[in-house]
Regions:
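Small-residue-rich hydrophobic transmembrane alpha-helices
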Residues: 15-78, 111-124, 128-129
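Short alpha-helical transmembrane segments in multi-pass integral membrane proteins
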Residues: 41-106, 148-200
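Short runs within selected transmembrane alpha-helices of multi-pass transporters and secretion channels
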Residues: 31-34, 103-122, 128-140, 144, ...
Length: 200
């Protein structure tokens, strides 16, 4: 994304770097959560306790959603206090603060999809997420952002020449990705339901 935004100039590049850095910092929480939950789910599965594995998988996604919404709220409510930590340039502060509106949505979805993808690996589901990533994040997110920024005539005037189209497209694509992974995980959990659940 940064390579496509660089052609817009220093203001866009600086604002995008602030937004991207905050998104990366926030991502550390769901990444850590996903690693921990997948390790525990795999342990339960390896021990033959499918019920506990299913319960923890569902709990992990709920924790990811709640923590993602909390951090998204912090970004939304505190953006005018957070961005000035990075820069004192008024123009960069204004544009980066506007981008954080979309970064908040981006992170909420990113948190859910991150934990889902780790949990799906516990059931050896890897190909379907790869297809979803390639089609939605690269096709819809990156290519869609490029189209909105440089080729779509109906792009809002205040988005032109800014990184906003890229963040809008990426955020929407990530929301769809998160929903797809939640649906896929629910399907996997139903397919591999514990024996006692199937009997009851």
């Amino acid at each position: 994304m940064a390579l496509f935004i660089a052609r817009q100039g220093a203001l866009s590049a600086a604002s995008h770097q602030i937004a991207a850095n905050l998104a990366a910092v926030c991502y550390m929480l769901p990444l850590s959560l996903g690693i921990a939950i997948s390790a525990r789910v795999s342990w339960w599965r390896g021990a033959g306790h499918e019920t506990q594995a299913h319960q923890l998988a569902r709990l992990g996604v709920r924790i990811a959603l709640v923590s993602g919404l909390v951090l998204a709220s912090v970004l939304l409510l505190g953006r005018w206090f957070i961005v000035p930590i990075y820069t004192s340039e008024p123009a960069v502060i204004a544009l980066a603060s506007a981008l954080l509106l979309w970064v908040a949505l981006y992170h909420a979805a990113d948190s859910v999809q991150c934990v889902c993808i780790f949990v799906l690996r516990c059931w050896r589901v890897t190909v379907a997420p790869l297809v979803v990533y390639c089609s939605l994040l690269w096709g819809g997110g990156l290519a869609g952002g490029y189209g909105l920024a440089y080729h779509y005539s109906a792009t809002p005037a205040d988005w032109v020449g800014t990184p906003t189209p890229f963040w809008v497209s990426s955020s929407v694509s990530l929301v769809v990705t998160a929903l797809a992974f939640v649906w896929l995980l629910r399907r996997v959990l139903r397919t591999h339901a514990p024996l006692e659940s199937k009997v009851s």
